[in-house]
């Protein structure tokens, strides 16, 4: 029994050490900017009570796993150029252009495994298990005939994203309640480099008074999608690999709890808060509260709530307890829309 508790203590200690490299350090990009924020009301014709502005706060580029798998090679810079009226190539090769440029825009790539799939597509990446992705989006593979194969690859990606290579990774995934922690293909340097690209691109294209950009990303959480209703896969499944069903379930069991997280100002974390840290949106809000105390303001906007199977606006919290005024204040502070 003593040995058992020592083993559990070691697991919890190592998980705690894992958390120490959370990427919550804050970087101030103010010195990198050549422009300053305009004075209030300096936008030509500005009227806060009468003007309507049009934009998009949900945009994926090649840094998002789903977009890249289905042929998107556009960068954040490409996306912002498109929003300002430029043309952009569709994955099938034809040009697209807006009739009129937008007023505001935010690239919101999935924070989860941000930038990973383009890295896997490089045949020289040296990462075992990425072979199906090699050369995925080279020109000769970007055609309509590849759609079916890409769909199969995407489904395989979803099924195998938790690659439980040993008991340790399976145990960590079980204790944290997040199967994605078992992935052996997560490269923190690739992740942070892609996030830095998202930040710097938004900063480059921000033109106060004419075109407003926001540094942002998508927090991609979801609820349990197996016959287990407690929210985490059974230990037997994680340790043996038997009977696991993480991606498919009756529609009333699983749901998407995605949020677009928008930053204000010029200070940003080294990496975004993702489902690798917690599937619980309330943990996202706590992280946002902590950032606010350190001078970084953020806003979360529920996304695709119709895909949550009614769980985006439950009358109970993540732990199944009835919501109260404290919960309402907590959520409204971070997610007022």
Tell me what each language-model feature is.
Residues 8-10, 113:
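Short amphipathic alpha-helical "recognition" segments used for binding
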Residues 21-337:
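Extended, charged catalytic domains and RNA/DNA-binding interfaces, predominantly
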Residues 1-8:
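Bacterial N-terminal signal peptides that target proteins for export
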Residues 17-19:
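C-terminal motif of bacterial Sec signal peptides marking the signal peptidase cleavage site
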Residues 11-15:
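Sec-dependent N-terminal signal peptides of Gram-positive bacterial secreted proteins and lipoproteins
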């Amino acid at each position: 029994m003593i040995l058992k508790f020592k083993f559990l203590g070691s697991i919890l200690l190592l998980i705690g050490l894992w958390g120490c490299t959370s990427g919550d350090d804050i970087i101030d990009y103010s010195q990198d900017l050549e422009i300053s924020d305009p004075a209030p009301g300096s936008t030509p014709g500005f009227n806060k009570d009468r003007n309507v502005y049009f934009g998009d706060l949900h945009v994926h580029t090649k840094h998002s796993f789903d977009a890249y798998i289905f042929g998107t090679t556009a960068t954040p810079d490409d996306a912002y150029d498109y929003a300002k009226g430029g043309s952009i190539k569709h994955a099938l090769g034809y040009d697209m252009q807006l009739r009129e440029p937008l007023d505001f825009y935010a690239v919101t790539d999935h924070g989860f495994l941000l930038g990973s799939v383009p890295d896997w597509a490089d045949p020289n990446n040296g990462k075992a298990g990425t072979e199906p992705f090699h050369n995925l989006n080279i020109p000769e593979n970007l055609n309509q005939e590849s759609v079916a194969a890409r769909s199969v690859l995407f489904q395989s990606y979803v099924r195998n994203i938790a690659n439980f290579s040993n008991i340790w990774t399976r145990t960590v995934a079980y204790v944290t309640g997040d199967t994605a922690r078992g992935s052996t293909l997560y490269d923190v340097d690739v992740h942070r480099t892609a996030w830095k690209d998202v930040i710097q691109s938004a900063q480059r294209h921000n033109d106060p008074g004419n075109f407003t950009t926001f540094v942002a990303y998508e927090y991609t959480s979801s609820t349990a999608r197996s016959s287990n209703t407690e929210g985490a896969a059974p230990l037997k499944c994680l340790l043996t690999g038997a009977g696991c069903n993480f991606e498919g379930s009756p529609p009333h069991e699983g749901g998407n709890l995605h949020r677009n997280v928008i930053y204000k100002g010029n200070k940003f974390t080294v990496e975004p808060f993702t489902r690798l840290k917690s599937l619980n949106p309330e943990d996202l809000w706590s992280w946002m509260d902590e950032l606010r105390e350190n001078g970084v303001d953020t806003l979360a906007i529920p996304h695709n709530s119709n895909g949550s199977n009614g769980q985006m606006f439950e009358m109970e919290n993540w732990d199944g307890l009835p919501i109260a005024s404290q919960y309402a204040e907590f959520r409204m502070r971070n997610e007022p829309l």
